[in-house]
């Protein structure tokens, strides 16, 4: 009988949907990855890895600030996990999907990791992202935005 090994599963960081309220609707911030980055030219959310003993909330605040120059007003955990196979590392990655609410008048300042950004309502955001799991995440977040903040138990503090 052949001995087998498992594909490694890792959870190195977070996927953060940055949202703002605009004209009684929510808009999603999507970032376009710069040409020198992995997944160059693709559109998605803020992503980032945990450093040291950071909590998830601390990772979110740091990564949102680094990639966009924004500071979240509130952060909450969704029930959704973004999961995919990462060929570069030959691992399955599972990342919690976190929502970061920013002020409606927020001005984005991009880092070198991204070359463009745009605020989208959910239907257009789903057409712009390059990954099916992010399309599903947008649907899930949109549904959660209808009930939040009444479910304040999901809010996390840095």
Show the residue positions of the predicted features.
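Conserved N-terminal beta-strand and adjoining loop/helix that marks the start
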Residues: 2-29
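A generic fold-level signal
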Residues: 9-11, 23, 38, 90-93, ...
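Conserved Nudix-box catalytic region and its N-terminal flanking loop in Nudix hydrolases
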Residues: 25-66
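Short aromatic/basic micro-patch
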Residues: 44, 92, 119
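Active-site segment of metal-dependent pyrophosphate-handling enzymes
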Residues: 65, 69-106
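NUDIX/MutT-family hydrolases
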Residues: 108-140
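Charged phosphate-binding loop/patch that engages nucleotide di/tri-phosphates or the phosphate backbone
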Residues: 130, 134-158
């Amino acid at each position: 009988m052949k001995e087998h090994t498992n594909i490694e599963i890792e959870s190195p960081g977070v996927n953060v949907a940055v949202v703002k309220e605009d004209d009684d609707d929510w808009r999603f911030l999507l970032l376009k990855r710069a040409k020198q980055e992995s997944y160059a030219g693709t559109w998605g959310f803020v992503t980032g890895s945990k450093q040291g003993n950071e909590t998830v909330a601390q990772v979110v605040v740091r990564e949102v600030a680094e990639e966009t120059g924004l500071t979240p007003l509130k952060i909450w955990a969704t029930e959704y996990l973004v999961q995919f196979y990462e060929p570069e590392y030959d691992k399955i990655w599972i990342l919690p999907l976190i929502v970061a609410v920013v002020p409606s008048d927020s001005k984005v300042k991009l880092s070198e990791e991204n070359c463009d950004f745009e605020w989208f309502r959910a239907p257009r955001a789903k057409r712009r992202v390059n990954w099916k799991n992010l399309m599903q995440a947008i649907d899930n977040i949109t549904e959660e935005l209808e009930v939040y903040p009444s479910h304040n138990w999901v809010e996390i503090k840095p």
